[in-house]
Amino acid sequence: MMRKHPYEILLDRKRKWSPVKPTVGVIRDEARATIGRALAARHLELPVGAFITEGLEKDVPDNARKLLIDNVKDEERHDLALGYYADAFGTNENDEKEGKLLRDAWINHPDHTITKALVAERSIFFVLLPFFRFNGCAALRTISAYISRDEQIHVGANSLVCRELGLRPSPSLDKLRKATINWIVKPLGINTKDRYLDKKFWTDASDRLMYEGKAPEFSETQRARMPAFFEHSNVNLPKYA
């Protein structure tokens, strides 16, 4: 029996789901402004998909193409799910404007598109999703859990592609990554009693994910309480394909 390629293994791990329009539950006051900014960062979801699509037109390994094409569909699903939640949560005009300016900065950055996708997913999305898990309502925690499962596969795929092609992020892309995460968590405090409301906790996590590819401080995410079914209105439960 032939061993499956890592790209095939990642593809086999996927589980389709469909976003639904949620109802917003109780949100911690201290986290509300940052959640608003993090939701504005959803404008990066479709560009990340476009980065992958553009990469497919270049020198991406042939055996990665099926997985990457499917990953683009995931990004469209994530954009829809977060858009539904943002509509229910309420958007801030200034946050939306800044989110789109950051989106444009990522689009216009000259690094390879797969590199940009990897950095955005590993060092931005991998920070925002745990933030939603620790500070969001039941609906937002559920959305973040489903997106997180997809993003683990995306980061695995993009890491393999970058390794095969010898791609590394430039210092200017790292600077853009820092500017992005710093803007999102700016409303949080410093040296707070609750570390999940501490700005430095989240910026440090982004740095470690960027430079080390891991953030041990997120080990609690695996044990973070997931919403029980009885906590939800049925409209908050994703639909499976």
Across the structure, where does each feature detected by a protein language model lie?
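Non-heme di-metal
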Residues: M1-A241
